[in-house]
Amino acid sequence: MGARVLVATTPGDGHVNPMVPVAQEMVSRGHEVRWYTGKAFRSTVERTGARHEPMRDAHDFGGMPREEAFPQHAGLTGITGMIAGFRDIFIEPAADQMTDLLALLEDFPADVLVTDETFFGAGFVSERTGIPVAWIATSIYVFSSRDTAPLGLGLPPSSSRLGRLRNTVLKQLTDRVVMRDLRRHADVVRDRVGLPRIRKGAFENIMRTPDLYLLGTVPSFEYPRGDMPPEVRFVGPFVSPAPPDFTPPAWWGELDSGRPVVHVTQGTVANDAERLLLPAIRALAAEDVLVVATTGAPLELEPMPANVRVERFIPHHALLPHVDAMVTNGGYGGVNTALAHGVPLVVAAATEEKHEVAARVSWSGAGVHLKKRRLSERDIRRAVRAVLDEPRFRVHAARLRDEYAARDAVVDAVDLIEGLV
């Protein structure tokens, strides 16, 4: 007899999409799956065979631009923007999420909770009820370590004596000064629902360690740590299933013309075209490459240089086998998917979290991290040429591709989740 599985995800593409194949696999194994997330994702949920449970008390911002869902974030950048996002998008809604989930459990007594790592309401429910919770990671590893600097600084790891001293000093500075208000807000939200304070670091102060923390990557793309908890497992990337109805555009045959193909994308959320998309197009206009740009949303981009092809969306499973380099803002899912295809990267991170992704691209040797907030066309052009012309980037990307290919993230994840039941 199958288990009762309650999935809960933040109502955003980057949180819902990695869960899709996991939910499908659980349904295919005979488990009864209900999935609590935003109304905008009802059809996505139902296609997996799970039953959609809409948000009620919790803030449902699914399908809304961030500036509309959180107008108070307008103009915020850097660490300030990261703190505001973590506070308002993930910490503040946790109490209402808990209320919704507890109401669902009265009708559906779940055996296990499966959630993305920033859906903290599920952690509250686990603490209240004892139901085990598994995290499906949608981004980099978030727990602090003696071997790494605090999240958001984009610094490489160091386990040397001096490196650990650096990490300790920076952690104390971050927790006591930079992130002090964020830690206090986590205390307030836990107080609100009657849970004791945890007294941990800035990004760990909101909920206890889950029963499983399933990282959607491989060890070679995450910093080594000597103090990683046993609940953490590497399973490989959670890649969404290919859409069944993709029709290639008329220019598709040009991908095999012999010119290097450069894919430029800003992902599904950060879509300020002047931040990366248009500068990259202008930077590569005179290069002997074919540029395939995806906008993620309708944009007025004409006229385009002769070597540029623009589409709103192209499935990565169809495009990436033809791509020689990818220029991206550092979305975790897109980066892992590119590396799973052996595609080296140029990453111009839009946020502090994405700077951490970009730092791992650089550390792993699979691409270039453009650290400037204001990018020149020359910066982008030089980075793309380096990735195309220097074999070392493709060698490291190919090494990661082979490591990814040895994993079956979905099967391994569901096997581990079943072990909690």
UniProtKB/Swiss-Prot annotation:
Query: What does the similarity note say?
Result: Belongs to the glycosyltransferase 28 family.
Keyword Lyase listed: yes
Q: CDD domains from the xrefs?
A: GT1_Gtf-like
Q: What is the lineage of its organism?
A: Bacteria, Bacillati, Actinomycetota, Actinomycetes, Pseudonocardiales
What this protein catalyses is: 4'-demethylrebeccamycin + H2O = dichloroarcyriaflavin A + beta-D-glucose
Q: What does this protein do?
A: Catalyzes the penultimate step in the biosynthesis of rebeccamycin, an indolocarbazole alkaloid that inhibits topoisomerase 1. Has a wide substrate range, including staurosporine aglycone, EJG-III-108A, J-104303, 6-N-methyl-arcyriaflavin and indolo-[2,3-a]-carbazole.
Superkingdom to which the source organism belongs: Bacteria
| One GO-annotated biological process of the protein | antibiotic biosynthetic process
**Membrane-spanning regions, if any?**
none
Q: Which GO terms describe its molecular function?
A: hexosyltransferase activity; lyase activity; UDP-glycosyltransferase activity
Name by which UniProt lists this protein: 4'-demethylrebeccamycin synthase
Keywords attached to this Swiss-Prot or TrEMBL record, sorted alphabetically, are:
Lyase
Q: What is its EC number?
A: 4.3.3.5
Note one Pfam family from the annotation: EryCIII-like_C
| Stored InterPro entries | EryCIII-like_C (IPR010610), Glycosyltransferase_28 (IPR050426), UDP_glucos_trans (IPR002213)
Q: Pathway it acts in?
A: Alkaloid biosynthesis
